[in-house]
C-alpha cells in the first residue's frame, strides 16, 4: 500500500478501507498543528495508478480470506476533499470497480475545500457516495480562528456546511478544547455551540489541544503572545460546550488527549 508518513483517521473510521489519495495538507499554516511534519513536502496528490494498485492489492488480500465486502472507504490525507470534483469522481469509480459493495466514501475536509465546489459538483459527489466527511472546525471563536491561521471565519462554517446539508452529504466535526487560550475557553465553547446548533453534525469529537515544541504555537507562547488554558479550564470549557449544544448529536471526547473520556448521545432539539 502506498502510505506516506503517519496515517491519521478518526476513531469511527476504524473498520473502513484506508486509501491514500493525497499526502500532506494544502493549508499547512495552523499554528498548533504538527501532524504532517514527518513528510518532506507540503502536499501531493497520489497518482491514479498508485490508487488503483492499492485497490488491486486489497482485493487480492481479501480474496485470500474469501471476503471482499468493503462497504466504506476513507480517503487518507489531511484534506482530500480539496481535489477537483472530477478527480474525486474518478476515485469513486475506481473504488466501485474493485469493490461494488462499497456504499460510501469519507475523508477529512477543510471548510475552504467545500467552498471550491459548485452546487452541481457537490450533488454529483453525493450521488457518487461521498458522505460523512470529517471537518476540523476546531472552534466557532473568530479570534482564535484568526490567531491560529485556520484560514476561515465562523460564518464560513455555517455557509459551507449548509451547502452540504442541501445535497445530502453528512458531516462530523472535530473541536479543539483549549484553542481559545486562558480565560477565553468557555466563551469559545458558547460560540462553537451557537455554530453547531445551526447545523446538523452527526458526530462532534473533542480533542484537547496539545502543544508540541516544534509547533508555531509553542513559539508564540515563548514570546508571551498566547497563554494556554489549565486542565481545569479545559474541562470547564468542555462542560460549557455540552451544556449549550441544543441538537441531537453523538458527542465524544475519548481520544488519547482527553484525560477523562466522555461520550454520550445528546438527544436535544432546537
Which residue ranges define each predicted feature?
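A short acidic, helix-capping loop that chelates divalent metal ions and anchors anionic groups
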Residues: 41, 141-147, 216, 260-262
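Conserved SAM/AdoMet-binding glycine-rich loop
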Residues: 59-166, 170
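Alpha-helix N-cap and loop-to-helix initiation/capping positions
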Residues: 43-50, 83, 87, 148-156, ...
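Conserved, mostly hydrophobic/aromatic
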Residues: 25, 33, 51, 75, ...
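Conserved C-terminal portion of the radical SAM core fold
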Residues: 132, 155-217, 232-255
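Conserved small/polar residues in nucleotide/adenosyl-binding loops
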Residues: 270
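Canonical Radical SAM [4Fe-4S] cluster-binding loop centered on the CxxxCxxC motif
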Residues: 6-53, 57
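Short, small-residue-enriched loops and turns at beta-alpha junctions
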Residues: 80-83, 111-115, 179-184, 212, ...
Amino acid at each position: 500500500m502506498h502510505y506516506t508518513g503517519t496515517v491519521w483517521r478518526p476513531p469511527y473510521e476504524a473498520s473502513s478501507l484506508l486509501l491514500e489519495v493525497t499526502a500532506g495538507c494544502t493549508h499547512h499554516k495552523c499554528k498548533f498543528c504538527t501532524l504532517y511534519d514527518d513528510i518532506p513536502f507540503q502536499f501531493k496528490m497520489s497518482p491514479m495508478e498508485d490508487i488503483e494498485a492499492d485497490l488491486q492489492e486489497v482485493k487480492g488480500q481479501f480474496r485470500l480470506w474469501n471476503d471482499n465486502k468493503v462497504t466504506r472507504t476513507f480517503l487518507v490525507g489531511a484534506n482530500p476533499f480539496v481535489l477537483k470534483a472530477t478527480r474525486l469522481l474518478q476515485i469513486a469509480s475506481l473504488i466501485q470497480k474493485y469493490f461494488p459493495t462499497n456504499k460510501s466514501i469519507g475523508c477529512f475536509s477543510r471548510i475552504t475545500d467545500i467552498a471550491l465546489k459548485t452546487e452541481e459538483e457537490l450533488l454529483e459527489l453525493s450521488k457518487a457516495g461521498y458522505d460523512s466527511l470529517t471537518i476540523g472546525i476546531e472552534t466557532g471563536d473568530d479570534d482564535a480562528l484568526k490567531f491560529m491561521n485556520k484560514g476561515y471565519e465562523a460564518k464560513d462554517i455555517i455557509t459551507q456546511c449548509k451547502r452540504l446539508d442541501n445535497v445530502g452529504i453528512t458531516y462530523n466535526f472535530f473541536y479543539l478544547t483549549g484553542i481559545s487560550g486562558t480565560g477565553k475557553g468557555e466563551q469559545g465553547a458558547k460560540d462553537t455551540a451557537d455554530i453547531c446548533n445551526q447545523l446538523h453534525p452527526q458526530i462532534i469529537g473533542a480533542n484537547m489541544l496539545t502543544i508540541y515544541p516544534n509547533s508555531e504555537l509553542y513559539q508564540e507562547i515563548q514570546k508571551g503572545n498566547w497563554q494556554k488554558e489549565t486542565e481545569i479550564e479545559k474541562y470547564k470549557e468542555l462542560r460549557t460546550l455540552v451544556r449549550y449544544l441544543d441538537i441531537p448529536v453523538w458527542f465524544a471526547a475519548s481520544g488519547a488527549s482527553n484525560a477523562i473520556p466522555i461520550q454520550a448521545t445528546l438527544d436535544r432539539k432546537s
